[in-house]
Each structure stands twice: as C-alpha cells, then as structure tokens.
Amino acid sequence: MNSEPSWTATPSPGGTLPVPNATTPWLGRDEELAKVEIGILATVLVLATGGNLAVLLTLGRHGHKRSRMHLFVLHLALTDLGVALFQVLPQLLWDITYRFQGSDLLCRAVKYLQVLSMFASTYMLLAMTLDRYLAVCHPLRSLRQPSQSTYPLIAAPWLLAAILSLPQVFIFSLREVIQGSGVLDCWADFYFSWGPRAYITWTTMAIFVLPVAVLSACYGLICHEIYKNLKVKTQAGREERRGWRTWDKSSSSAVATAATRGLPSRVSSISTISRAKIRTVKMTFVIVLAYIACWAPFFSVQMWSVWDENAPNEDSTNVAFTISMLLGNLSSCCNPWIYMGFNSRLLPRSLSHHACCTGSKPQVHRQLSTSSLTSRRTTLLTHACGSPTLRLSLNLSLRAKPRPAGSLKDLEQVDGEATMETSIF
C-alpha cells in the first residue's frame, strides 16, 4: 500500500476539498459517471451565471441611492457569480480533460479561488442576516449611522474569505499521482495521517456548522421581536378602535382629546417593523433555507468519509458522493430566482411583462406599518372632515404637543428606509 495519503484529484465541489475512498482507478476513471457530472456542472454553470448576471444588470440600472438590502443582494449575487466562474467552471473543464492542465501556480490559484468563493458566499449571507437582525431588533442604531453599519458588514466577508482560503495554496500542488508514473494532477498533500480529517472538519465548521448556528440564533431573535411587535400593534389597534367608538357617542371635544392621546403613542413607535423590513426578512430566510438544503448533503458526506474508517467505497457510493458534492453548487442557482420571486422588478422584461399582463392588479400598500407624523395628521383630518370645529381642535392639539427634534428626525429616517426598501423589494 502506498505510504502517501490516498486522496484523489476529484475535488468537491469544483475541486475545493479532496475526497477519500475513490473508486476510480489511479490512472483511470468511470467515464459514464464523468459524463453525468459534466452534464450537471454545465447546467449549474449556465443557470448560476445567467441568473446572477441578470440580477447584477438589473440592480446596476437603478439610478437612485442604494438601500442596505440593495447592496447586500448586489454583493451576494457577486459571490454566487464567483462560485459559478471560479468553482463550477474550473471543475467542468477539469472533468472534461480528466487531469489538470496547467502549471503548479495555476493549480494553487484555482484551488484558492474555489474555496474563496465558498467562504465569501456563506459569509455574505451571514452578513445579510446580521443586517436584518440590526434593522429589526436595533433599528435606531442602524439608522443613525447607516454607512458605518453597512459597509463593514459587506467588507468583512470578502476579507475573511481571502484570509481563510490561504491554506489551499499550501495544501494543493501539481504532483505525480503515483511516484514515477509521470502522470501529474492538482492534488492535496498532507504530511500527517490525521491531516485530511482535521482539515475537512475545520472547513465544515467554518463554512457550514458555525454560520448555520449564528443564522439560527439571529432568526430566533428576529422572530421574537416580530412577535412582540405584532402583539403591540394588535393592542394599539384595539385601543384606537375603542377610541373612535367613544367619539361616535360623545362630543367633538372628546374626540380631540382621544386623538391627542392616540397621536404620541402612534408616532413615537419608532421601533415598529415596516412591511418592507418583514418582506426582506422573509427573503433572507428563504435564502438561508436554500443554503442549508444545498450544502447539508455535501458536508455530511465529507464528514462521513473522513470519520468513518469503514465508509464503503463501492460504485454506488461513488455516485452518491459525486451527486452530494454537486448539490452545494445549486445554492448559487437558487438565489437569483429567490430575489426575483420577492421582487418582480428583478425579473427579465419578458417575464415581468407577462406577469403584469396575466396577474391581478397591483395592490397599493402603505410604505410603513406605522405612519409618519404627516400621514397620521392627514388620517385624523380625513375622519373629521365633516366638522370645521373638530378640524380646528385637532390642529390646535397637534400644535400644542410638539415632538422633540430627535424623535422627528428618527421618524423621517425610518420612513426613508422603508421607502427605499419598498422600491427594491
């Protein structure tokens, strides 16, 4: 038995990690399985490249100021495009040629970019979820200094991905598959027997287990905050309806008093969650579910292969390994369609026109679940339009209780954010 670690040149996915217990011979392979893999990779490449390019081109056409979600979707589409170009495409070419065709420098560069795209895509999704957590659970903190809270979250995934991918440069190299055979390939080389197990375990923890744990914690807190918000809104709605029923049985002066009491609580609810925010939370949640569904089989097979010494290596297992490794790439195909599903403006013009023609009439929604100071005043005046005396009393009551400058500024910021998010999603 060869003293070198028996790790094949078959990467996973796209040549990112070495795979043990391969059934293909050292100097041959299963051609039928290779054809299936080439077909799947070609399909994934076309779908991922086309979908993410469509999203990038659509977002690039918008001339207005980009919202936070706009920027995160833009960069997540960039990372998914990187998965297609730097991970799927090299593996597709590699499967066609069977052996790596290139220099040692190109081998190390390809391996580095393959894992970099995986790290960047995962951590950008994590940053997007953290941004939604801040927007829902700590809205004022993210609104007072939006640039200082957004750009670090966008830059951090790229920086971490660039650093954490560096081991690939030292692990992989162009070397002989069997000493003295003269057949070269881009393979991993571990000096210790426990090296593959340690490396794959670390990669699984860094790319899948820990991010999923953080994502779950964030969405648990987000759901708790939304539940509290809905409970407060329900109670406020009951009090407001009770106040208007009192107005039906009382004089106009009683109405002015009830309106004055209701106004501060309605306006000062800066922390209420807009429908636009809830919609972006739903979109991010669906992306997270797709990410877990696509990557869970891949990392499960990877961990099984290095921790179970009795892992079978029959042909059927090789097929299962190969299909599981390719499933992770589907995440980059799903994300663009999730964006388009939550925002018809990102659809191609032909599909968007078809949806407009066949769909129902668009409904007009409020940009905020809680109106601003101006819209609240208009609502009160609309209900009281039949009484000049009541209009005067309401105006006087509004002028008699001025809002602090800081609160009004916060309200304007909340309204601006909701408008921006509604225009994109």
Curated annotation (Swiss-Prot):
Task performed by this protein: Receptor for arginine vasopressin. The activity of this receptor is mediated by G proteins which activate a phosphatidyl-inositol-calcium second messenger system.
Disulfide bonds: C107-C186
Main localization (coarse): membrane
Protein name as annotated: Vasopressin V1b receptor
Cellular localization per UniProt: Cell membrane
Molecular function per GO: identical protein binding; peptide hormone binding; vasopressin receptor activity
One Pfam family matching this protein: V1R_C
Segment forming the signal sequence: none
One CC-aspect GO term: plasma membrane
PROSITE patterns named in the record: G_PROTEIN_RECEP_F1_1 (PS00237), G_PROTEIN_RECEP_F1_2 (PS50262)
Topology term for the membrane: Multi-pass membrane protein
Highest taxon above the source species: Eukaryota
